[in-house]
């Protein structure tokens, strides 16, 4: 099966918690993985630098990210701006998805629906 890639502009959430261990730099690439032992959110997806959690994928889209990773997809995060206030301190980024063509198309549709629903609710 053919592989594809896609990008999704968003943020890394929770920088206010991790700011003592991480100073984000524009262009920095970070790992994204399912956080299986998160007692507060069973869909949590963490953003990591050198295997240390420095933030999380926004809760509104974490379930979609988790499904993508569970089905063999890969996600990386690239910092695109300076931290700002939002839900705590947020760091602007682009999430890079890599996986099977069919799954990429489905994930991007789900992300579009998820974020559209949030904007209008």
For each of these PLM feature ranges, what is it?
Residues 1-121:
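Conserved active-site motif detector
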